[in-house]
């Protein structure tokens, strides 16, 4: 089989780069692999613009949850011809790595490679918002502000700690603006909306019983988000 492995260098530190190289070396032992490293969005987009030409059997993304979501959207945007046996593999190299938790993946090189070369794959539920797709979760309001405020370079250095720092900052200085949303024909004014296609939130914190392989999207609408109501919802 012909593999395409794309590693988002912005998603991880040097230690994870060593891990990616170990996986790559193991994968190359019995397979053909085209390997790409990207530092910019434009570099990644260029790869996907030419993706149809190579007739890849597998796409492997080494990066975070956002890297996988980006890849899916670029494949669709560029009208990729999905073969019946085409599959996307994943090497966790991001910060939160919700997908790693969702798939109950371990961090052993041999185990990851065995999954990547296997034919044991399943279709994931894909959700569309406007012109973009997501497969884990999408939010607008409180947590979206936190994610948007985080500098990618600082996140690469501090890892998950930066989410805690920014989360605490936005918790202390909560300043919500009402959002207008229509859901199932009913109108709401809300402070935070979270649509989840996964059981996990913010790492390994379980919020649902669903998973990415089930058509059971769960949407939370926080109409009056306060510090107390947020703590109650989390705990």
Locate the predicted segments by residue.
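Catalytic core of DAGKc-family lipid kinases
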Residues: 6, 38, 77-192
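Glycine-rich phosphate/pyrophosphate-binding beta-alpha loops
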Residues: 139, 143, 194-206
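Short amphipathic alpha-helical segments
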Residues: 17-19, 72-75, 101-103, 206-207
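Catalytic phosphate-donor-binding core of small-molecule kinases
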Residues: 117, 167-179, 213-235
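Short, solvent-exposed amphipathic alpha-helical segments in soluble enzyme
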Residues: 20-23, 52, 76-77, 151-152, ...
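ATP/NTP phosphate-donor binding region
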Residues: 1-62, 73, 111
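Cofactor-binding loop segments of dinucleotide-utilizing enzymes, especially the Rossmann-like FAD-
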Residues: 8-10, 93, 222-224
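Short glycine/serine/threonine-rich phosphate/pyrophosphate-binding segments
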Residues: 44, 66-71, 98
